[in-house]
Amino acid sequence: YAAAKASYAGTDRNSGEWFGIPENEMPPFGVVNNESDLVYDKLGAYNGGWLSGLAYQSGMIGANQANVNDTYYHSAFAEWDQNNQNWYSDSRPDDVGLDVSESGAIDQYDFSFAPNISNRVFIGATIAVTDLNYRMSSSYFENYLYTDNSMDYLDWGNTLRVDGTGYSFNLGVIVRPADYLRLGVAYNSPIWYKMTDSYWGYADTHNENYPEDPDVSGETPASPYPYTNYKLRTADKWIFSVAGIIGQTALISLDYELGNYKYMKLSDPYGYEHYEALNHDLIQKDFGLPHTSKLGAEVKITPQFAVRAGANWRTSPMKKEFREGAFEVFPAVTVAHYTLDKGTISYSVGLGYRFTPNFYMDLACVYRQYKEDAYTFSKVIIEDNNGLHALVDSEAIGLKTNTTQVALTLGYKF
């Protein structure tokens, strides 16, 4: 993957032409110093240059020194065929592993206003301030076992920090045309974020093909960690709801949400889109209109005691071709792995008890199933006069995450 990204960096998708990263512009092989830091700064001008640069610096890939006409980069891991005095053309790792640790939070502070018109029309407006933080660290390895019982290996690690602050607004109206019926519509605006990403990557290899220097390592600049400031406009959505009251004991509700990921936007800290057409085209091609349906019901067993149940179905915001791995994905900096959302289903049950007209307690249990496909690296696809070509293929790892959460709420109504 890294060799292909280095060989075909800077691909012009319109003309079908590309150029690779010149070897003399790669970070110094096996050297970690201020000079290599400066080289990484230059690599920022290339598509995927940092990842390929780290792979070269740590000895994972290299140029073919025996053939000056070969302008491509190749994997440094291959087994020597003693009988034919040549390298085996296909050398694949015997053991591969990826460990990913993630944490984060989204905190939202709401300022709301809600007038009531004749107890028939209810209007709500909210201005929200959102703080976001995300932390990711990952470690990837490949082990190569050879017929002489020797073993080569590579290790690849990354750390990514994402921080952001944004604002948004929400508007909603609920109409009660009859005592037993509620109709609602709401609009949730995009969140306009100011974001900062900081990142660091390292890699090391052990390769007996180079017995004079089998252990090589490299890392991206670390003092301070490189960072990128940018702006992000997220998706907005519309919400439509209907609720019916059955006598004095039951209520049933249905909500439908329509998100709009097609008009998300990335820009620099000043709001300029340096690759406006490319960003717009990729977002339009990869993302669509996800749907969320919610169904809920509540039954009062006694005037004080109620039982609740609900379900939530959410489709992926990614278009079918994208989430099935048909397109190349461009991860951040030296991070090669990523996941593609395939939808969420959740079910909930709850109990509610009102001790007094003002004091109440709720107990809820939510079961959630989230599906996604994980990739250790993306396909590498180029386009020329003969059409699209996949230089590197990548297989998905299907993941299914099941969680159960229990929440106890105590409330007092003033």
Which positions does each model-derived feature cover?
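Outer-membrane beta-barrel porins/channels
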Residues: Y1-F414
